[in-house]
UniProtKB/Swiss-Prot annotation:
Pfam families: EF-G_D2 (PF22042), GTP_EFTU (PF00009), IF-2 (PF11987), IF2_N (PF04760). It comes from Bacillus cereus (strain ATCC 10987 / NRS 248). It comes from the Bacteria. GTP binds at residues 197-204, 243-247, 297-300. NCBIfam families: IF-2, small_GTP. Residues 297-300 are annotated as: G4. One of the essential components for the initiation of protein synthesis. Protects formylmethionyl-tRNA from spontaneous hydrolysis and promotes its binding to the 30S ribosomal subunits. Also involved in the hydrolysis of GTP during the formation of the 70S ribosomal complex. Residues 243-246 are annotated as: G3. Residues 188-357 form the tr-type G domain. GO terms for molecular function: GTP binding; GTPase activity; translation initiation factor activity. The gene is infB. Keywords: Cytoplasm, GTP-binding, Initiation factor, Nucleotide-binding, Protein biosynthesis. This is Translation initiation factor IF-2.
């Protein structure tokens, strides 16, 4: 005979676990709790013990027969309908007694369970589960969801094992990625390098020096507006560079660059030192867990002080190798081209130490660096292949879009047929413009790729619809629900997706008390008539970044009086919107005490109330001021003046050292010695 637990034996013999444990103690058998295992010897002793106490079958039958007879006799005296109901209740009770439900050894669930569902799985009454939850301090109803910890707590109390089922999504790329690549299949790949740093410290100039080109002059305001990806060859080895904009407004783009990068080059100007965005770049690189190489730029300037840069960076745990640390510092002059070769050698050295590898013999996976809509070519996406090999003709799913790779162009504009790990390529053939930062995956079967792409698009659409319907409800009832809170609606259009994201992120960060920013629509490309119609319906301002409205959009905007703001520099946008938001705010007031008067005598007048004869001790009392009644240093009332008189004449104000008569609106409990403090509310300039 196998061992049995205390609670199982108790259930088998229709007794409570507590009574059984008491009985075992009487028999000098030690048990710690209801989960204790009972061996065969103890079970036999218990069987004998309960057998002696159990009534005989004949006795049970006799008792049962008497009960049945008595019930039958009593039923004769009742109405027929009532008797039938009692009989049904008896039969139901009988079935309940005879039906025994076994407690499961293990239950499974996914996500969460309601109290009712948990009771069903545990073969218990919901009321029993609710009672247990109450004892644990949890007030729950039968339809209330329980979290994983609570489910495990209740199940373990019954000695039942709990297992959570993980639902595998057919739209997640991880579902289709096989297990880790075997070491023998991994090959060396180029390092992906991101250049970061403060504005105007020379990030784009450094990249230009590496690529022997001058891009800086063509950018508006000296800002690198778009993320680009380039590949260079050094000593027969390749290095891939991601060019992330350095301004704080492009935090999202820079963070995305750090997620796909292997090495970060931190550019710090030797004459400026560490600046706010330098620290921000350090934090992004550290969060991504990538090695940092510090390029001390502008060494050709007379004010260059590399030692100060090193000293400042030690505060951020970037200690130079020369000072006993492990951070590589390379002095360079990007504009003169000095130190560039040394910097590239350091990148190759770090790559060699870190051993960056990937498996080229599989279908490609990677990240979207940039995406835009071209009139001639259609959707163009810049992809960084991170694992596997991408080939022309491969079915591909990119974010919520899908298609087949029609053509691939390298960073230097040449058509290529294959792209291995760490290679940036520009592809065409997608059905829609993906989001910058989206993951992509190539498939063997076009039908499967289409199915996954459509499913992902459907999921995104449902989520978007849910979000839109929620926002529209807030629009309808906003004034009722929020009252004084104002809101500014914006539509953001830009030339590329990266700029759209950066602009939206910057605008959402604007913090002006009392006003919210709501971006109701974003998009890539020219401002269209549909954008203007949406702006008109939503009372929104349209912001164009490096784009212009088409002819129809201009005409419609004039008819609908829609405000369109066009910019090429992001900071102009931020400043303009902040100003608009501050203008929309209700004026802010602060209190200013203008005078005090002491109550010298009081007079009670019928139909008027209490008149206080006062002496102005400080400042002045004005007719339109608010007042406080102060008695023994405690404010006992706050309200408005009703009348202010000198002798029998109404006056606008009474100055210091003059007497006056005062009545307070809706207040008559004035006493001699009270202090009347007068104040006004002044508008505060923002």
């Amino acid at each position: 005979m196998s061992k049995i637990r205390v609670h199982e034996y108790a259930k088998k013999h229709n007794i409570s676990s507590k009574d059984l444990m008491t009985k075992l103690k009487e028999m000098n058998i030690e048990v710690s709790n209801h989960m204790t295992m009972l061996d065969d010897e103890v079970v036999n002793k218990l069987d004998n013990e309960y057998q002696t106490e159990k009534p005989s079958v004949a006795d049970e039958f006799e008792v049962e027969e008497k009960v049945v007879r008595s019930k039958k006799n009593s039923n004769k005296k009742k109405k027929k309908g009532k008797g039938n109901e009692d009989k049904r209740q008896e039969n139901f009770a009988g079935r309940q007694q005879t039906q025994t439900v076994e407690t499961p050894d293990k239950i499974t669930f996914s996500g969460s369970l309601t109290v009712g569902d948990l009771a069903k799985k545990l073969s218990k009454e919901p009321s029993e589960i609710i009672k247990k939850l109450f004892m644990l301090g949890i007030m729950a109803t039968i339809n209330q969801d329980l979290d994983k910890d609570t489910i495990e707590l209740i199940a373990n109390d019954y000695g039942i094992e709990v297992e959570e089922e993980v639902i595998v999504s057919e739209t997640e790329f991880e579902t289709f990625i096989d297990e880790q690549d075997d070491e023998e299949n991994l090959k060396e790949r180029p390092a992906v390098v991101t250049i970061m740093g403060h504005v105007d410290h020379g990030k784009t100039t450094l990249l230009d020096s590496i690529r022997n080109s001058k891009v800086t002059a063509g950018e508006a305001g000296g800002i690198t507006q778009h993320i680009g990806a380039y590949q260079v060859e050094v000593n027969d080895k390749k290095i891939t560079f991601l060019d992330t904009p350095g301004h704080a407004a492009f935090t999202t783009m820079r963070a995305r660059g750090a997620q796909v990068t292997d090495i970060t080059i931190l550019v710090v100007a030797a004459d400026d030192g560490v600046m706010p965005q330098t620290v921000e770049a350090i934090n992004h690189a550290k969060a991504a867990g990538v090695p940092i190489i510090v390029a001390v730029n502008k060494m050709d300037k007379p004010a260059a002080n590399p030692d100060r840069v090193m000293q400042e960076l030690t505060e951020y745990e970037l200690v130079p190798e020369a000072w006993g640390g492990d951070t590589i510092f390379v002095p360079i002059s990007a504009i003169q081209g000095e130190g560039i070769d040394n910097l590239l050698e350091m990148i190759l050295l770090v790559s060699e130490v870190e051993e960056y590898k990937a498996n080229p013999n599989r279908y490609a996976t990677g990240t979207v660096i940039e995406a835009q809509l071209d009139k001639g070519k259609g959707t163009i996406a810049t992809l960084l292949v991170q694992n596997g090999t991408l080939r022309v003709g491969d079915p591909i799913v990119v974010g919520t879009t899908f298609g087949r790779v029609r053509a691939m162009v390298s960073d230097i504009g040449r058509r290529v047929k294959v792209a291995g790990p760490s290679t940036p390529v520009e592809i065409t053939g997608l059905n829609e413009v993906p989001q910058a930062g989206d993951r992509f995956m190539a498939f063997a079967d076009e039908k499967k790729a289409r199915q996954i792409g459509e499913s992902r698009a459907q999921e995104a659409l449902l989520a978007q619809r849910g979000e839109k319907s929620k926002l529209s409800l807030e629009d309808l009832f906003q004034q009722i629900q929020e009252g004084d809170v104002k809101e500014i609606n914006l539509i953001v259009k830009a030339d590329v997706q990266g700029s759209v994201e950066a602009m939206a992120a910057s605008l959402r960060k604007i913090d002006v008390e009392g006003v919210k920013v709501k971006i109701i629509h974003t998009g890539v490309g020219a401002i269209t008539e549909s954008d203007i119609i949406l702006a008109s319906a939503s009372n929104a301002i349209v912001i164009g970044f490096n784009v212009r409205p088409d002819v129809n959009a201009k005409r419609t905007a004039e008819l609908e009086n829609v405000d369109i703001r066009l910019h090429r520099i992001i900071y102009k946008v931020i400043e303009e919107i902040e100003a608009a938001m501050q203008g929309m705010l209700d004026p802010e007031f602060e209190e200013k005490v203008i005078g005090q008067a002491e109550v010298r005598q009081t007079f009670k007048v019928t139909k008027v109330g209490t008149i206080a004869g006062c002496y102005v001790t400080d400042g002045k009392i004005t007719r339109d001021s608010g007042v406080r009644i102060i008695r023994d240093g405690v404010v006992i009332y706050e309200g408005q003046l009703d009348t202010l008189k000198r002798f029998k004449d109404d006056v606008k104000e009474v100055a210091q050292n003059y007497e006056c008569g005062i009545t307070i609106e809706k207040y008559n409990d004035l006493k001699e010695g009270d202090i009347i403090e007068a104040y006004i509310m002044e508008e505060v300039k923002r």
